[in-house]
Amino acid sequence: MAAAGAPDGMEEPGMDTEAETVATEAPARPVNCLEAEAAAGAAAEDSGAARGSLQPAPAQPPGDPAAQASVSNGEDAGGGAGRELVDLKIIWNKTKHDVKFPLDSTGSELKQKIHSITGLPPAMQKVMYKGLVPEDKTLREIKVTSGAKIMVVGSTINDVLAVNTPKDAAQQDAKAEENKKEPLCRQKQHRKVLDKGKPEDVMPSVKGAQERLPTVPLSGMYNKSGGKVRLTFKLEQDQLWIGTKERTEKLPMGSIKNVVSEPIEGHEDYHMMAFQLGPTEASYYWVYWVPTQYVDAIKDTVLGKWQYF
């Protein structure tokens, strides 16, 4: 006799549950070699696409105006756009350089520009326009106009050190010696000139002030012989002209070893000043009744900033 079975159309209890359990717990099918290589290739393409999205934009071609927009015609890099410019003629070592430069830039910035043109370090430069150009003032403040000539005097560091190291020692010795002496204006050789009194055409003085050299010669002074003397600063030739009634001495400023000065007792708004033209004090050329406001400008113009190196 056949065993009794389930009625037609009815499933035996538990069959679906067991099938689902078998399907869930069946181990993953092993991946063959071809499928593994395909997966690796797809990953590499995704990685390459990601890297490509991070690449920088291609550089502008050489002739592209956008690449040249930051380069101005004669202006400072990164400086002149939107600023008022003046045309300057910078003259150094008998060579003229025509440049455009912002009118509101300082003397210090002008030195940096000169450095970029000539290679002369700023500390070695003596920059002159109607006297020494102040580093902390703008070209507008010192009334520089378009077409102005800017004179530059300077030497290499090695040349300056070779010339000035002995000079520094000589200056220190001279100062130490002066401290031991009585004031210069009391010494007999100076007293005989000072006792004449002020020259009738002496220039006005401004006590406690420092001014740039005037555009005209300094006059109304005496020399050690009591004769009238005038000083003319020829900046373009880098010369000091010492003029008397008899003749005019034209001295290269680089030949002047030192400049000393001292206020005149009882007339402290005037100085007596000497230019050292040789190796000893005997070579001093004395000038009396120099207005005090020009003393520092004379020293800076003749000796330059590098005198302290």
Curated annotation (Swiss-Prot):
<feature type="region of interest" description="Disordered">
    <location>
        <begin position="1"/>
        <end position="80"/>
    </location>
</feature>
<feature type="compositionally biased region" description="Basic and acidic residues">
    <location>
        <begin position="174"/>
        <end position="185"/>
    </location>
</feature>
<feature type="compositionally biased region" description="Acidic residues">
    <location>
        <begin position="9"/>
        <end position="19"/>
    </location>
</feature>
<dbReference type="GO" id="GO:0045296">
    <property type="term" value="F:cadherin binding"/>
</dbReference>
<dbReference type="Pfam" id="PF00240">
    <property type="entry name" value="ubiquitin"/>
</dbReference>
<dbReference type="InterPro" id="IPR019954">
    <property type="entry name" value="Ubiquitin_CS"/>
</dbReference>
<dbReference type="InterPro" id="IPR039120">
    <property type="entry name" value="UBFD1"/>
</dbReference>
<feature type="compositionally biased region" description="Low complexity">
    <location>
        <begin position="35"/>
        <end position="57"/>
    </location>
</feature>
<dbReference type="GO" id="GO:0003723">
    <property type="term" value="F:RNA binding"/>
</dbReference>
<feature type="region of interest" description="Disordered">
    <location>
        <begin position="171"/>
        <end position="204"/>
    </location>
</feature>
<protein>
    <recommendedName>
        <fullName>Ubiquitin domain-containing protein UBFD1</fullName>
    </recommendedName>
</protein>
<comment type="subunit">
    <text>Binds polyubiquitin.</text>
</comment>
<feature type="domain" description="Ubiquitin-like">
    <location>
        <begin position="84"/>
        <end position="159"/>
    </location>
</feature>
<feature type="compositionally biased region" description="Basic and acidic residues">
    <location>
        <begin position="192"/>
        <end position="201"/>
    </location>
</feature>
<dbReference type="InterPro" id="IPR029071">
    <property type="entry name" value="Ubiquitin-like_domsf"/>
</dbReference>
<dbReference type="Pfam" id="PF25343">
    <property type="entry name" value="PH_UBFD1_C"/>
</dbReference>
<comment type="function">
    <text>May play a role as NF-kappa-B regulator.</text>
</comment>
<dbReference type="InterPro" id="IPR000626">
    <property type="entry name" value="Ubiquitin-like_dom"/>
</dbReference>
